[in-house]
Amino acid sequence: KLAPSLKPKKRYILFKILPETKGKTFWKREVIEALEQQIIKCFGIFMHAKASPMIVKETFEEKSGQIIIKVGHKYTDELKVALALLKQIKDHNVTIEAISTSGILKKLKERMHHQTGKA
């Protein structure tokens, strides 16, 4: 078993997808496909493997447009830039902004639900 100090450190980043068209929502599959393609496009295959970004699938909320992505702690800034450069999802203009970063998923989920008004 690996000692905790030797385990790869990770960060969870809460992103918000802001569509240009007010009230527009996206299907979970559309968002995940667009984000994964953008990450590979910006990171390249080698850096993608090192950063190991993963979309925490159960965290996507269609109404609020929020999603949490897990990434290696050294690559948080690169991930934020890669997703900020994403301008379209399914032919709709979008802006993606990073809301918060945490090393603990539970804390980020609480922040996410606090922002959307859920308990």
Where in this protein do the model-derived segments appear?
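A short beta-strand motif that forms part of the nucleic acid-binding face
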Residues: H73, L83, S102
